[in-house]
């Protein structure tokens, strides 16, 4: 302890000597440089690795990057659009909206049509049969068109009008097999499969009619937003190429249709609950560049949903037609039908329900969500596409580094960077020239410098004052 006190007392005297100061500086620099060299050598990292190896089994892609996912809940997106589901092979339901307690039942039965003798003629107008229930007008039109019925060429639809306010109305499509209606029956069967999914058929007991009635929704089956998308696309008049046109622009909104420039926050009303993630303008910009992603299809659907929600609140057929034109631009290359083909061929496909992405927990950056594929009715295991999300992690890191580089380039003037670079080149070149030492003038061997005269190789002055001396000359660098 006494030696330590004596050392502190002698510090002023110690630093009075310049040599001691130099030694202290050199010692400090050597210690710091030694620590840096030891750290860069990797021996400390190797020791930490050997101590912690096998103690952490967390599911992480890399440093500060996590593999995360979320599930789309279409009920939060389409508040006013119908939802479809199948109860059994012959009974399906179309709920008017996700908040409605009314539904339209579609039965594929083997009962012979009995209503056509006394029913009114229906030509795309259902008012006479659904008196007191105008909310079923457009859903009936979409369902009949979705099944593939043509009012001009196909057999007429029969209906039994409502007798009272709370009574049922009934519509029947005649599928009795005959040479004239065989094609019509096949077309309706294809429409049922397309809207409600595959079902088991028994060729020995052929169905004779499709019956549609109004009923109440009591949770008879679970909704499928894939069927809802098929229902919307089936009623679209045409499909256009999926790419932003010259006048195309993104419009961000909340569930009520109000502009929300902050981005798509996927919480509560939209995709996921619990403030999981907000995909803002960055994701929108990526979708404008790479618009072949299933997630971009969903974002485009949300974008069109803004005006659709405002118009559907009026519960008019014009509003529904406006939504039809919006859906036309949703999925151009018909991904739903393509996925249906993949489902039949047992190839993994996207059902627009679950998406995965890479999240950088430290910076908050994330990759554009990609669809979690389905095979044989279940989601793929994470190990089945491990290479894909590891590669996506690398792309995210590369994108972040590129943004940081561009940001730094923007903060540092390029002229200053160029000036610093060329000044360093000039200093290095001048140092090299200084070490080489180029000769500058001639001397007569054994004589002093002849300044201000300059000698030629014969020892004579170039100005003519001195004649040839015949003495040896040599080059010198310094005077």
UniProtKB/Swiss-Prot annotation:
The gene is GPC. Residues 33, 440-479 are cytoplasmic. This is Pre-glycoprotein polyprotein GP complex. GO terms for cellular component: host cell endoplasmic reticulum membrane; host cell Golgi membrane; host cell plasma membrane; membrane; viral envelope; virion membrane. The cytoplasmic domain of GP2 plays a role in ER location. It also contains a zinc-binding domain that allows SSP retention in the GPC complex by accepting a cysteine from SSP as the fourth ligand. Belongs to the arenaviridae GPC protein family. Stable signal peptide (SSP): cleaved and functions as a signal peptide. In addition, it is also retained as the third component of the GP complex. The SSP is required for efficient glycoprotein expression, post-translational maturation cleavage of GP1 and GP2, glycoprotein transport to the cell surface plasma membrane, formation of infectious virus particles, and acid pH-dependent glycoprotein-mediated cell fusion. The record marks 33 as: Important for GP-C-mediated membrane fusion. A lipid is attached at residue 2 (N-myristoyl glycine). One of its GO terms (biological process) is fusion of virus membrane with host endosome membrane. Residues 2-17, 54-58, 59-418 are extracellular. The record marks 58-59, 245-246 as: Cleavage. GO terms for molecular function: metal ion binding.
